[in-house]
């Protein structure tokens, strides 16, 4: 592992999930209006259909984690999303909506908006990454899988058995893997699993992922201060499988932490949270 490897830190701020879903619902509304005007080509119509299916699935999953009073339909979210667009496009805080207020600071020199200087969202107060403990939270009966002196086939089978017997709810999973006498990346995962009547188990939420190099130094950290919610059941297994595959490839060199972080984030469409430098390490 390169000595200049820096810790990859990713934070998802509170309210981000709702804001993203609502905004995408507003985009869907725009697509549908274009379709009504027969202004969409075939690729555009395909994107409309895929976005609608994705949003319907994501809203259904997200509503399960919300109190009944806060659950919203796709149509309700479309209306909020359109208002959000007005706020963003016209920089008008008076058009703001509850739960979505653009951050601004006084700056009389700004020509387009004499009272505001529009900036990126600041870090969530009290939730800076440096203030968050490094280790994932404690959970009852944590699962640790040690894969030493095992071939890839046996390692995969052991992981599958351990995960499939894990009870539903929050859990902590530690995976250690020795490959050709080199201790590979150590990954700690906090997540919430749902167990279905047919015995199928799916990852519904990923709360935290820490990755450490062979010296025990933290090199990648995914912190979900607002949970990253998996959009459909199949995603849960794909996310974990993408992790496990990195331990089962049998590389002689230690697995790269940044690559693992990219692999996990890509399942949520969050690759942009890694800088190019971090992604290349």
Swiss-Prot record:
GO terms for molecular function: protein serine/threonine kinase inhibitor activity; RNA binding. Disulfide bonds: none annotated. A motif (Nuclear localization signal) lies at residues 50-55. It is found in: Host cytoplasm; Host nucleus. Transmembrane segments: none annotated. GO terms for biological process: symbiont-mediated suppression of host ISG15-protein conjugation; symbiont-mediated suppression of host PKR/eIFalpha signaling; symbiont-mediated suppression of host type I interferon-mediated signaling pathway. Residues 1-93 are annotated as: RNA-binding and homodimerization. Its main location: host cell. InterPro entries: NS1, uS15_NS1_RNA-bd_sf. Residues 1-103 are annotated as: G1P2-binding. Keywords: Host cytoplasm, Host nucleus, Host-virus interaction, Inhibition of host innate immune response by virus, Inhibition of host interferon signaling pathway by virus, Inhibition of host ISG15 by virus, Inhibition of host PKR by virus, Interferon antiviral system evasion, RNA-binding, Viral immunoevasion. One of its GO terms (cellular component) is host cell cytoplasm. Homodimer. Interacts with and inhibits human G1P2 conjugation by UBE1L. Binds and inhibits the conjugation of the ubiquitin-like G1P2/ISG15 protein to its target proteins. Since G1P2/ISG15 is an early antiviral protein, NS1 may inhibit the host antiviral response. Prevents EIF2AK2/PKR activation, either by binding double strand RNA or by interacting directly with EIF2AK2/PKR. Also binds poly(A) and U6 snRNA. Belongs to the influenza B viruses NS1 family. This is Non-structural protein 1. The gene is NS.
């Amino acid at each position: 592992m390169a000595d200049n490897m820096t810790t990859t830190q990713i934070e998802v701020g509170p309210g981000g999930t709702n804001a993203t879903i609502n905004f995408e619902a507003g985009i869907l509304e725009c697509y549908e209006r274009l379709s009504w005007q027969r202004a969409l080509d075939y690729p555009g119509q395909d994107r409309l259909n895929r976005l609608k299916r994705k949003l319907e699935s994501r809203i259904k999953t997200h509503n399960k984690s919300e109190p009944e009073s806060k659950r919203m339909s796709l149509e309700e979210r479309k209306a909020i999303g359109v208002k959000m667009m007005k706020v963003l496009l016209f920089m008008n805080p008076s058009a703001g909506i509850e739960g979505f207020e653009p951050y601004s600071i006084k700056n009389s020199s700004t020509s387009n908006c004499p009272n505001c200087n529009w900036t990126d969202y600041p870090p969530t107060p009290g939730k800076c990454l440096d203030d968050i403990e490094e280790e994932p939270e404690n959970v009852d009966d944590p699962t640790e899988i040690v894969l030493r002196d095992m071939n890839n086939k046996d390692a995969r089978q052991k992981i599958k058995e351990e995960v499939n017997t894990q009870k539903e709810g929050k859990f902590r999973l530690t995976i250690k893997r020795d490959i050709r006498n080199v201790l590979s990346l150590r990954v700690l995962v906090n997540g919430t699993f749902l167990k279905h009547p047919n015995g199928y188990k799916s990852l519904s939420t990923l709360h935290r992922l820490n990755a450490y190099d062979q010296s025990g130094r933290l090199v990648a950290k995914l912190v979900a201060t607002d949970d990253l919610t998996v959009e459909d059941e199949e995603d849960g297994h794909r996310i974990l499988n993408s992790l496990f595959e990195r331990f089962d490839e049998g590389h002689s060199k230690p697995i790269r932490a940044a690559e693992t972080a990219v692999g996990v984030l890509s399942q949520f469409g969050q690759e942009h949270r890694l800088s190019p430098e971090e992604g290349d390490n």
